Amino acid sequence: IIGLDMAVPQYYDSMDINIPLMKLASWAAYMGVIRLIPGISESDAVKYGTLSDEEKEVYKVVFYSRTATVTMINETKSVKENAEKVNKMGVPQLPILLFISDGSGGTGFDKETWRKIPIEYISQVDDGKYIELDCPHYVHDYEYETISERIREFLSSQ
């Protein structure tokens, strides 16, 4: 298992999920109002990733038409319950490599807490490793070369 700043079940214990705000965002997207909010479609993928200009435009079109959909809201409503189900299954004893961000970029956690939770999780795995990255949550937009290199090293050691 290779996790790019993945959310382990313990994150959801204290995560505050604002469903009314998501429903408001859904309405704003449906009505097209979301397009009037400056910079809202300027995600890390657009600002820092490797997308071409054409791909950035496609990203924005998809973002505006598929933001806060009913499916996304339903998934969010179920996420804590689903995390508890996963937690009850226990930590898998498989080779796991976690890339851990600094928690910035919308996680809702401070750096220390964001890093502490997956480090505690991976410490329960016999063949578990982690790499801390000094970048926001969407690590693949910032550290894709490091991630690629370290994944290759990890896989070749298995």
Regions found by a protein language model. Give the residues of each.
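Flexible "cap/lid" loop of the alpha/beta hydrolase fold
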Residues: 2-32
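Short, solvent-exposed loop/turn segments at secondary-structure junctions
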Residues: 7-9, 102-105, 136-138
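Phosphate/oxyanion-binding loops and surfaces in catalytic or ligand/nucleic-acid-binding neighborhoods
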Residues: 10, 79-82, 154
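Short glycine-/acidic-enriched loop or helix-start segments at secondary-structure transitions
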Residues: 12-13, 18, 108-110, 142
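Active-site microenvironments that recognize anionic phosphate/pyrophosphate groups
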Residues: 36
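Helix-loop "lid/cap" segments that line or gate small-molecule binding pockets
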Residues: 40-51, 56
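Conserved serine/cysteine hydrolase catalytic core
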Residues: 51-131
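Catalytic active-site module of serine/aspartate enzymes centered on a nucleophile-bearing elbow/loop
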Residues: 123-158
